Amino acid sequence: MRPRALAFGFACLALCIGRASDAQITPLFVIPTESAPVAVAAGASLRVLLTASEPAKLADKLGVRAQAGATSFEYTIGAYPQIAGSADRTWLEATFVIDYDQPEFAPLKTEMTDLGPKPTRAQIVEFVNRTVDENTPRGWDLASIVAKRRQGDCSEHAVLTAAIARLYGIPARVTVGIALLSDGKGFAAYGHAWAEMQEAGTWVVADAAMLEQAANVRYIPMGLMEDEGMGYVMSLAGLSNQWIQKVAVLGPAD
């Protein structure tokens, strides 16, 4: 077995063990949500009250302040919610997870020729959306595996989107957090993963898994996949200490 495959096998085992404790099979799971009927225009800022296991740490990541001893804090979801990443990273390199330099990408590169020399974020997102079968939960596959199998859920869409963006010289990263989805009557929150691409110095959501719901979804980032090496699963598991336990929708921001 190749070293990469062996390491990936151990990573998957660790991930499965970690999920067994909370009975989660895929990264997409329901978060308890309080949401009275509220009219919020698409793209408008939204006020929410977040309850988390370590609210102070999460609030600091999101650039807001949580009161000492409080278990929840208020947060306004804007157009481009984001958290700061490592300042010394370009988010362009091929890594163990975002491994666009592997041979499994060769057939995909041929299919991407129609995208031109520098595709837009929308083009990449649409390409991944139609390429990956979203009804096949996997569990944080490497980008090269997604390129070969073309199966997965939100995490597979995210890593493949980031890989293709970097392949074209566009800074991209993977974010883990909450997708807050509106049905026109209220909101429901789900654990989610998505890619972000850098445009004019701003990180912008590039979510191929929820392309069809793009007008009705808002994002609450909790952390980045900072470690894209062999220890990526343990890095992601560390975010569980700050996981959002409940979302209460307060209404549109003033």
Where are these regions (language model features)?
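Bacterial N-terminal signal peptides
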Residues: A7-C16
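Generic recognition of flexible, low-complexity loop/linker segments
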Residues: S35-A36, G63, T113-D114, R149-R150, ...
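Hydrophobic/aromatic-rich core segments of domains that either
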Residues: H157-I244
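Secondary-structure boundary elements
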Residues: W91-G152, L160, E226-E228, G238-D254
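Positively charged n-region of N-terminal signal peptides that target proteins for export
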Residues: M1-R4
